[in-house]
């Protein structure tokens, strides 16, 4: 059973959910964590059969009513509810009531009103799970990337790129890629221009990244690096030298992924005691409930959750 959190009620999450269900595209057993009022609103707004809302399996959180829904607008009440959906689904996954959870987008600013330290789904779910070491993975047909750090300032990202953390992410990446691809050839991107060029542009590549790569090789992993950041994605996507890239910071991985396949990327959190995948896009307030949101990333996230949880036959 997959648990689906409906995300921010003023964004595209509920629309994507009900449209995917209406189109018969949700093949896996699932249950939604959210509010009945939001489902009913989405069905009505999209001109779908009124009975559809009652047919969608739901763990009704009872947090939002119809007047709370203001499409395209940021709402602190809606942001708080979206976080609570995620927490509820995570607890049920930890209790083995769910095989995996699939999350639809939240708005960080809307959620921070009730959770001042909120920085994203990844960190919230990790907190509920006891804060194990985790990494964000983005995956599409063309590219898989993971991140040593994500939602922090670039100056802080450089500080976080320690040998221990990089090795941790390499291990998590290797384990996940083995379940998704025939091979697990991992490239580790450098942090400085030209991977430091032997210290000419910074020492971190040689003093922090290279030792992690060497240790991963000793553990039997097929790992290369530090690879220059300006060529590693070309060598991965065009030359098929690697199956995944470990990136040192948020934009290093997100820019190539979203350039290659904005609608077809899937986000997964590696290192949790549960399986969690997500769409690789935001709330898109500007098109909420207009019937134009792309459901592809959501369906791929459902598919990946099934594969990672071992439920696929």
Report the location of each language-model feature.
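Contiguous, glycine/small-aliphatic-enriched amphipathic segments in soluble metabolic enzymes
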Residues: 1-121, 164-248, 252-266, 272-275, ...
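Ligand-binding beta-strand-loop-alpha-helix segment within the catalytic cores
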Residues: 53, 138-160, 164-167
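Short, flexible loop segments at boundaries between secondary-structure elements
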Residues: 127-143, 270-286
